[in-house]
Amino acid sequence: MEKPAELVLIPSPGIGHLVSTLEIAKLLVSRDDKLFITVLIMHFPAVSKGTDAYVQSLADSSSPISQRINFINLPHTNMDHTEGSVRNSLVGFVESQQPHVKDAVANLRDSKTTRLAGFVVDMFCTTMINVANQLGVPSYVFFTSGAATLGLLFHLQELRDQYNKDCTEFKDSDAELIIPSFFNPLPAKVLPGRMLVKDSAEPFLNVIKRFRETKGILVNTFTDLESHALHALSSDAEIPPVYPVGPLLNLNSNESRVDSDEVKKKNDILKWLDDQPPLSVVFLCFGSMGSFDESQVREIANALEHAGHRFLWSLRRSPPTGKVAFPSDYDDHTGVLPEGFLDRTGGIGKVIGWAPQVAVLAHPSVGGFVSHCGWNSTLESLWHGVPVATWPLYAEQQLNAFQPVKELELAVEIDMSYRSKSPVLVSAKEIERGIREVMELDSSDIRKRVKEMSEKGKKALMDGGSSYTSLGHFIDQI
């Protein structure tokens, strides 16, 4: 009789990738009661906020599913927190964890109760393929962004390695690129920032190249959302099998993992939303790393005041210059906002710090979402049927903005090519236009399409749905 399979999941450091990884861990063990998961937790100091509490909340769970998910904390490492050092050393940090990963997995391989079936490594942890190879087990990649982005990265890597084409040549270019995973020509100005700088493009394309060594790629998406991109990927014989298994979202966050102050803030926010009419509130939130300088904050404030719509604005203080840290809450918003703004808008708006994003998007009073277009936020807004006005900041968010606006007609645009720390301000006029557009979609096809895509995303996870079936194929593979 064959032993139950044990998969080792290795997420990148930081809460963002960890949440998606644990969602797929829960999904896997819920589908197969003979499957066990071990999650290896790396502690990179600059991005470790919230990780310990989140893991502990799951480890403390008494559900049968959680009992088959084991966590191993790898040794802590002290590192410099300056911006340059973190950017340059994250890859090196992950590489340095290889011996710790090998040690942690040694006991699993020798287990008399389970069979080590393979590694599922985060998109930034492909160096752990080396460890899997040493142990003689297969590797898979978990890609936390969308299929169109995955296709773009494979395309850029192929251009470099087969045609000697340097993607950094597209920096400041007005060119439009033909990418198989995108239906429309892609403006070079929405390429991920790291693809436009040699120091970051080269190592990142090397990471993507290693995807080709694996036995499969799990992607947090679903067929109805990205059918064109998924078809393009499956048509390329040089790319491993792609398994769309999303949308993977943490919709039932455990209140025990947040402190009592955050619970109080959440209750206060939801109470305020309870008093607003249906679909009347525009929600502005820019992710765990999103913040603006004071001049841009004033442009947003002026736009909100002139637009006249009810609003809930998550406004956070930028970290000190030169340091990599999460934005923090202001002690007092009055110093950064235009004089008298809070008094003039007190009847229609609420300015907050930290926001319980999923709970807010789920609230019936919310009718629009001004978002940085992180992939998780994009999926969350679709799940809850809330149209987005796009304002990307960093990473692949410009792609995530282009796709729903131009490819799928599921969003409106404030700015698709804006980048964090850009010297160019997005004007109050542009922001106001985007707010009005996203909030006045009552008779628009966009709101209707968003609602339809919401239903398709939910059906994808149901028995017989596209993602349900795809996950089953992956389980059969292991």
From Swiss-Prot:
Transmembrane segments: none annotated. It comes from the Eukaryota. The lineage of its organism: Eukaryota, Viridiplantae, Streptophyta, Embryophyta, Tracheophyta. Its EC number is 2.4.1.-. One of its GO terms (molecular function) is UDP-glucosyltransferase activity. InterPro entries: UDP-glycosyltransf_plant, UDP_glucos_trans, UDP_glycos_trans_CS. Keywords: Glycosyltransferase, Transferase. Belongs to the UDP-glycosyltransferase family. The keyword tRNA-binding does not apply. This is Putative UDP-glucose flavonoid 3-O-glucosyltransferase 3. Coiled coil: none annotated. It comes from Fragaria ananassa. Pfam families: UDPGT.
